[in-house]
């Protein structure tokens, strides 16, 4: 049994690692190759390219790197047509992976797409292309599965692996102890998550640093912690803190985002996977996000949903405050954080709703996804 997988960012690398583990538990002789990051490689994936070569976000940013992306795509298609795997799994990265899946399905390779493209949010006409490109969609969220069923696309709602990983009752005290934070009854902790990609952190660093300064003016005893996934991100963020004169107010960590959020009373985060993880950790949050101006202009005209953060999409309502583009100002963010820090009934309500949403996603996702992938491979496995 040979499984080809392609992931292009950290969240996909984590999903892919769990999937590989679960497939190997059922099929010990399975082999894995494709494109993945350190987590997938640690589970045995042979990666033909560095995952970072595919880690590009936003319409403008994709155009800048298009020649490289097309070259890698051509190579992968040629490689898997010449030496077909038993099944191909594209993990997220829809504009890249769906084109590979369509070409491989046309020559008889079973194809699975893990993580639904956001067709329910924008470019809904893509659902027909998806149906022609994949044998099965593995959806992380129930509303996604409902959308595909309405359009006649085979789909499994597998749940979200993060919902299985995070405890239903997180322990803030244990997280603070693990991070070496002094839990001395002082001021509240605010976690800052400006993003996991360089472009995101570059766009958000000054905004978040100025927000720290504004919030300290309102509530001087607030303490700040921030996880940055790698040293380059840390350097960009630290420079912004220095320029705003608040570098002494923020304790930086390399990685450890889960622990940092668990240790916090309130989280300020960019949109994306971090909003889901903050929800699973039952942490009240404020969401702030900026895109490249042209990308935002285009997205405003294409997107068909009212919310961008995972808690709001899951709940179907505006549970958490979202500040996007021009609305993401230091004054707005500082005031939103101040209100959350000083409104315990609201925070308690959010924690209770987050616990309900957590339960809907807790389904043993790695195992369910592995079973679906092996079923798609059918008699092709050995």
UniProtKB/Swiss-Prot annotation:
The protein's matches in InterPro entries, at most eight in alphabetical order, are given as: Glyco_trans_19
Which pathway does it operate in?
Answer: Bacterial outer membrane biogenesis; LPS lipid A biosynthesis
Q: What class of enzyme is it?
A: transferase
Q: Which UniProt keywords apply?
A: Glycosyltransferase, Lipid A biosynthesis, Lipid biosynthesis, Lipid metabolism, Transferase
GO CC annotations on file: membrane
Q: What does this protein do?
A: Condensation of UDP-2,3-diacylglucosamine and 2,3-diacylglucosamine-1-phosphate to form lipid A disaccharide, a precursor of lipid A, a phosphorylated glycolipid that anchors the lipopolysaccharide to the outer membrane of the cell.
Question: What protein does this entry describe?
Answer: Lipid-A-disaccharide synthase
């Amino acid at each position: 049994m040979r499984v080809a997988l392609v992931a292009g960012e950290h969240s996909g690398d984590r999903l892919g690692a769990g999937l590989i583990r679960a497939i190997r538990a059922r099929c010990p002789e399975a082999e894995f190759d494709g494109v993945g990051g350190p987590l997938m490689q640690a589970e045995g994936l042979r990666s033909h390219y560095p995952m970072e070569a595919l880690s590009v976000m936003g319409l403008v940013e994709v155009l800048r790197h298009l020649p490289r992306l097309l070259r890698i795509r051509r190579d992968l298609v040629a490689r898997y047509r010449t030496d077909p795997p038993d099944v191909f799994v594209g993990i997220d990265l829809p504009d890249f992976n769906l084109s590979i899946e369509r070409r491989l399905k046309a020559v008889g390779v079973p194809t699975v797409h893990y993580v639904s493209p956001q067709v329910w949010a924008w470019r809904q006409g893509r659902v027909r292309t998806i149906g022609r490109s994949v044998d099965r969609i593995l959806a992380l969220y129930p509303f996604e599965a409902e959308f595909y069923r309405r359009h006649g696309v085979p789909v499994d709602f597998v749940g979200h692996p993060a919902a299985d990983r995070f405890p239903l009752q997180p322990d803030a005290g244990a997280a603070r102890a693990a991070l070496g934070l002094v839990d001395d009854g002082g001021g509240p902790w605010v976690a800052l998550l400006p993003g996991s990609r360089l472009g995101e952190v570059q766009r958000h660093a000054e905004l978040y640093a100025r927000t720290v300064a504004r919030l300290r003016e309102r509530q001087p005893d607030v303490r700040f912690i921030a996880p940055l996934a790698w040293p380059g991100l840390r350097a960009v963020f630290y420079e912004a803190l220095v320029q705003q004169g608040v570098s002494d107010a923020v304790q930086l960590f390399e990685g450890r985002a889960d622990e940092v959020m668990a240790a916090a009373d309130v989280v300020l985060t960019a949109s994306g996977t971090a909003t889901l993880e903050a929800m699973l950790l039952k942490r009240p949050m404020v969401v702030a996000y900026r895109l490249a101006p042209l990308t935002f202009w285009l997205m405003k005209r294409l997107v068909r949903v009212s919310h961008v953060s995972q808690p709001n999409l899951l709940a179907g309502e505006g549970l958490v405050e979202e500040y996007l583009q021009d609305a993401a100002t230091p004054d707005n963010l500082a005031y939103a954080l101040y209100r959350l820090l000083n409104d315990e009934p609201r925070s308690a309500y959010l924690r209770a709703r987050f616990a309900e949403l957590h339960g809907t996603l807790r389904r043993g996702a790695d195992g369910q996804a592995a079973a679906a992938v092996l079923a798609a491979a059918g008699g092709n496995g050995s």
